[in-house]
Design a protein with these regions (language model features):
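A short Gly-Trp-Pro
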Residues: 1-10, 15-163
Length: 163
Protein backbone atom coordinates (compact mmCIF):
# COMPACT_ATOMS: atom_id res chain seq x y z
CA UNK A 1 0.00 0.00 0.00
CA UNK A 2 1.21 3.49 -0.84
CA UNK A 3 1.79 5.91 2.01
CA UNK A 4 -0.60 8.53 0.64
CA UNK A 5 -3.60 6.27 0.06
CA UNK A 6 -6.59 6.98 2.27
CA UNK A 7 -7.91 4.23 4.54
CA UNK A 8 -11.48 4.38 5.85
CA UNK A 9 -13.15 2.92 8.90
CA UNK A 10 -16.25 3.29 11.02
CA UNK A 11 -18.09 2.21 14.12
CA UNK A 12 -20.75 -0.52 14.01
CA UNK A 13 -23.71 1.86 13.52
CA UNK A 14 -21.91 4.18 11.08
CA UNK A 15 -22.36 7.36 13.16
CA UNK A 16 -18.58 7.64 13.57
CA UNK A 17 -16.56 7.47 10.39
CA UNK A 18 -12.87 8.05 10.06
CA UNK A 19 -10.15 8.29 7.51
CA UNK A 20 -6.43 7.63 7.89
CA UNK A 21 -4.43 9.60 5.34
CA UNK A 22 -1.30 7.40 5.54
CA UNK A 23 -0.77 3.70 6.01
CA UNK A 24 -0.43 2.55 9.63
CA UNK A 25 3.01 2.56 11.19
CA UNK A 26 2.63 -0.88 12.76
CA UNK A 27 -0.12 -3.36 13.63
CA UNK A 28 -0.04 -5.60 16.68
CA UNK A 29 -2.27 -7.98 18.58
CA UNK A 30 -2.33 -7.48 22.35
CA UNK A 31 -3.20 -10.40 24.62
CA UNK A 32 -2.90 -8.54 27.95
CA UNK A 33 -5.57 -9.00 30.60
CA UNK A 34 -6.69 -5.36 30.32
CA UNK A 35 -7.35 -5.62 26.58
CA UNK A 36 -9.23 -8.87 27.11
CA UNK A 37 -11.53 -7.31 29.70
CA UNK A 38 -12.02 -4.12 27.68
CA UNK A 39 -12.93 -5.97 24.49
CA UNK A 40 -14.52 -9.11 25.92
CA UNK A 41 -12.31 -11.07 23.55
CA UNK A 42 -9.08 -13.08 23.57
CA UNK A 43 -7.04 -10.18 22.19
CA UNK A 44 -7.30 -6.88 20.37
CA UNK A 45 -5.62 -5.80 17.13
CA UNK A 46 -4.41 -2.18 17.02
CA UNK A 47 -2.86 -0.24 14.16
CA UNK A 48 -0.64 2.64 15.21
CA UNK A 49 -1.01 5.83 13.15
CA UNK A 50 0.44 9.33 13.35
CA UNK A 51 -2.03 11.54 15.23
CA UNK A 52 -2.25 14.06 12.39
CA UNK A 53 -3.32 11.37 9.90
CA UNK A 54 -6.56 10.37 11.67
CA UNK A 55 -9.63 12.41 10.67
CA UNK A 56 -12.77 11.53 12.66
CA UNK A 57 -16.36 12.50 11.80
CA UNK A 58 -19.16 11.98 14.29
CA UNK A 59 -19.47 12.20 18.03
CA UNK A 60 -17.09 10.19 20.20
CA UNK A 61 -16.87 10.01 23.96
CA UNK A 62 -13.77 9.05 25.86
CA UNK A 63 -12.81 7.23 29.02
CA UNK A 64 -9.57 7.50 30.96
CA UNK A 65 -7.94 4.13 31.41
CA UNK A 66 -4.79 2.81 33.05
CA UNK A 67 -2.98 -0.09 31.44
CA UNK A 68 -1.47 -2.96 33.40
CA UNK A 69 1.89 -1.26 32.91
CA UNK A 70 0.54 1.81 34.72
CA UNK A 71 0.49 3.88 31.52
CA UNK A 72 -2.48 6.22 31.16
CA UNK A 73 -4.64 6.33 28.05
CA UNK A 74 -7.92 7.64 26.69
CA UNK A 75 -10.22 5.27 24.82
CA UNK A 76 -12.59 6.81 22.26
CA UNK A 77 -16.02 5.29 21.60
CA UNK A 78 -19.02 6.01 19.41
CA UNK A 79 -21.61 7.73 21.63
CA UNK A 80 -24.47 5.87 19.92
CA UNK A 81 -23.34 2.23 19.57
CA UNK A 82 -20.33 2.14 21.92
CA UNK A 83 -17.83 0.81 19.37
CA UNK A 84 -14.30 1.34 20.66
CA UNK A 85 -12.67 3.14 17.71
CA UNK A 86 -9.23 4.31 18.85
CA UNK A 87 -6.96 4.95 21.83
CA UNK A 88 -4.56 7.73 22.74
CA UNK A 89 -1.81 6.27 24.95
CA UNK A 90 0.20 8.86 26.90
CA UNK A 91 3.32 6.79 26.26
CA UNK A 92 2.81 6.81 22.45
CA UNK A 93 3.72 10.44 21.78
CA UNK A 94 2.42 11.65 18.42
CA UNK A 95 0.55 8.42 17.72
CA UNK A 96 -2.94 7.00 18.09
CA UNK A 97 -3.97 3.35 18.01
CA UNK A 98 -6.94 2.55 15.79
CA UNK A 99 -8.89 -0.65 16.41
CA UNK A 100 -7.87 -2.46 13.24
CA UNK A 101 -11.13 -4.37 12.92
CA UNK A 102 -13.01 -1.06 12.55
CA UNK A 103 -11.23 -0.49 9.21
CA UNK A 104 -13.19 -1.15 6.01
CA UNK A 105 -10.57 -3.70 4.97
CA UNK A 106 -8.80 -4.83 8.15
CA UNK A 107 -7.24 -7.87 6.51
CA UNK A 108 -4.83 -5.53 4.69
CA UNK A 109 -3.20 -4.89 8.09
CA UNK A 110 -2.51 -8.22 9.81
CA UNK A 111 -0.60 -8.22 13.10
CA UNK A 112 3.13 -7.75 12.72
CA UNK A 113 3.60 -8.77 16.36
CA UNK A 114 1.75 -10.40 19.24
CA UNK A 115 2.39 -8.82 22.64
CA UNK A 116 1.75 -9.95 26.20
CA UNK A 117 1.54 -13.56 25.13
CA UNK A 118 2.17 -14.46 28.78
CA UNK A 119 -1.59 -13.78 29.11
CA UNK A 120 -2.57 -15.50 25.84
CA UNK A 121 -5.46 -17.95 26.06
CA UNK A 122 -3.93 -21.44 26.23
CA UNK A 123 -6.15 -22.79 23.45
CA UNK A 124 -5.14 -20.03 21.01
CA UNK A 125 -2.45 -20.98 18.49
CA UNK A 126 -0.40 -18.16 16.97
CA UNK A 127 1.30 -18.04 13.59
CA UNK A 128 4.97 -18.95 13.63
CA UNK A 129 5.50 -16.22 11.00
CA UNK A 130 4.70 -13.35 13.39
CA UNK A 131 7.01 -12.15 16.18
CA UNK A 132 5.68 -12.92 19.65
CA UNK A 133 6.69 -11.11 22.83
CA UNK A 134 6.09 -12.20 26.42
CA UNK A 135 5.29 -8.59 27.29
CA UNK A 136 6.00 -5.42 25.32
CA UNK A 137 8.84 -4.89 22.87
CA UNK A 138 11.11 -1.99 21.95
CA UNK A 139 9.65 -0.34 18.82
CA UNK A 140 13.12 0.89 17.87
CA UNK A 141 14.10 -2.76 17.40
CA UNK A 142 10.83 -4.25 16.15
CA UNK A 143 9.21 -1.63 13.92
CA UNK A 144 10.22 -1.12 10.28
CA UNK A 145 12.81 1.62 9.76
CA UNK A 146 10.42 3.46 7.44
CA UNK A 147 7.85 3.73 10.26
CA UNK A 148 10.45 4.91 12.76
CA UNK A 149 11.57 7.59 10.29
CA UNK A 150 7.98 8.76 9.78
CA UNK A 151 7.53 9.16 13.55
CA UNK A 152 10.84 10.98 13.92
CA UNK A 153 10.04 13.35 11.04
CA UNK A 154 6.56 14.08 12.38
CA UNK A 155 7.77 14.77 15.92
CA UNK A 156 10.48 17.09 14.58
CA UNK A 157 7.89 19.09 12.60
CA UNK A 158 5.53 19.16 15.58
CA UNK A 159 8.30 20.42 17.87
CA UNK A 160 9.30 23.15 15.41
CA UNK A 161 5.68 24.34 15.13
CA UNK A 162 5.35 24.63 18.91
CA UNK A 163 8.44 26.83 19.27
Amino acid sequence: MENNQSIKGRCKCGEVKYQITEKPLFTQACHCKDCKVLTGSSYVVNSSVLENTLKVEGEVSSAKLTAGSGAASRAFFCTKCGTYVYTDYDSAVGRLNVRTKTLEDPDKFPPQAHIFIKDKDPWLNLSENVNCFVEMYDPKVTWPEESLNRIKDYLKIKKNKSQ
